[in-house]
């Protein structure tokens, strides 16, 4: 959603966004080794040019993580405890990275299948991310608290808040900014990047407001590959679901496509998934299965399920 590094001279208050072309180039090179980002040179006018490394077209990317030795299903799962995530604290921004991002690099935590970025962000009042570029990435934002103001190079201006979901297909290239709309409270949101199954598509933006009654003690689909399905859609065979559960509620999740894995993120509360105990902000990935048994172990447990291809 925002750029893949956090430098104070780049991401500033609304009243101070000046930066140099060289700063921007150095800034971009720090994150994701160029994946999902491009440099828009002022000398090119409105022409957007990729100047840093790109993803190789649809090469297998594997699982890229170690098996979870504590899991009851062991060799086909991985657990990422909340306190093991990478962290960036710039005062105005606190971001926790499940996977390698910006200055946090862990070769054992680069991605889960096509799920490349899962950032848990908190931005202070009136602050945010100045205009910056992306290309060839599906970018999903899920606000948890507060209001986030979005502007982009396609002419979209929007406010997203808790209960909404936002998606951008960066495709051939998009510029956007995101700011905390409020001057008296922080905004918290999840930023998720998914590798697309089609490159250089026409950029697009969408957002919807979810009917939260549909996620009471069950999973509500919020994202899929199909524009006609419930929720937003992306260029990938991925499905996202949100559920809000009372204590001791049990449910079963059916994997949507053979070859997909499931990455579960506990937004709040606690749960057991396939017998694995998980607390708030823990992540748990599992593959080579057809379904998952899930049990909430506290009141008001909120779980995000990301059902994604394990190979490209």
Positions of predicted regions on the chain:
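N-terminal secretory signal peptides
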Residues: 1-26
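N-terminal export signals
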Residues: 12, 26-47
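C-terminal segment of N-terminal export signals and the immediately downstream linker at the start
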Residues: 22, 43-74
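A short glycine-rich, His/Asp/Glu-containing loop-to-beta-strand
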Residues: 88-133, 137-138, 189, 196, ...
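Histidine-centered metal-chelating micro-motifs
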Residues: 128-130, 147-150, 166-167, 171-179, ...
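Glycine- and acidic-residue-biased ligand/ion/polar-headgroup-sensing regions
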Residues: 137-151, 164, 255-274
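Short acidic-glycine-tyrosine-enriched beta hairpin
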Residues: 154-169, 275-290
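Ligand-binding loop in jelly-roll beta-barrel domains
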Residues: 170-200, 288-312
């Amino acid at each position: 959603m925002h750029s893949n590094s956090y430098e104070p001279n780049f991401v500033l208050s609304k009243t101070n966004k000046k930066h140099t072309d060289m700063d921007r180039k150095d800034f971009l090179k720090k994150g994701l080794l160029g994946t999902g980002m491009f440099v828009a040179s002022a000398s090119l006018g409105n022409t957007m040019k990729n100047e840093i490394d790109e993803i190789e077209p649809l090469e297998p990317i594997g699982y890229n993580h170690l098996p979870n030795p504590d899991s009851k299903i062991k060799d086909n799962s991985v657990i990422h405890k909340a306190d093991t995530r990478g962290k960036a604290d710039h005062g105005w921004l606190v971001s926790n990275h499940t996977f390698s991002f910006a200055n946090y690099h862990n070769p054992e935590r680069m991605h889960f299948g096509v799920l490349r970025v899962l950032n848990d962000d908190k931005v202070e009042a009136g602050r945010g991310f100045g205009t910056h570029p992306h290309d060839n990435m599906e970018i999903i934002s899920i606000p948890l608290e507060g209001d986030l103001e979005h502007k982009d190079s396609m002419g979209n201006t929007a406010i997203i808040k808790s209960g909404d979901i936002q998606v951008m297909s960066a495709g051939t290239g998009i510029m956007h900014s995101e700011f905390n709309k409020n001057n008296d409270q922080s905004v918290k949101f999840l930023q998720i990047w998914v590798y697309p199954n089609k490159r250089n598509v026409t950029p697009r933006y969408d957002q919807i407001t979810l009917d939260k009654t549909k996620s009471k003690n069950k999973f509500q689909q919020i994202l899929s590959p199909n524009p006609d399905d419930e929720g937003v859609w992306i260029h990938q065979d991925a499905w996202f679901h949100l559920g809000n559960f009372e204590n001791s509620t049990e449910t079963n999740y059916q994997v949507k496509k053979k070859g997909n894995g499931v990455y579960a993120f506990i937004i709040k509360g606690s749960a057991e998934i396939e017998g694995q105990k998980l607390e708030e902000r823990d992540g748990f990935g599992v593959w080579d299965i057809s379904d998952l048994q899930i049990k909430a172990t506290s009141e008001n447990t909120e779980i995000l399920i990301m059902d994604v291809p394990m190979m490209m």
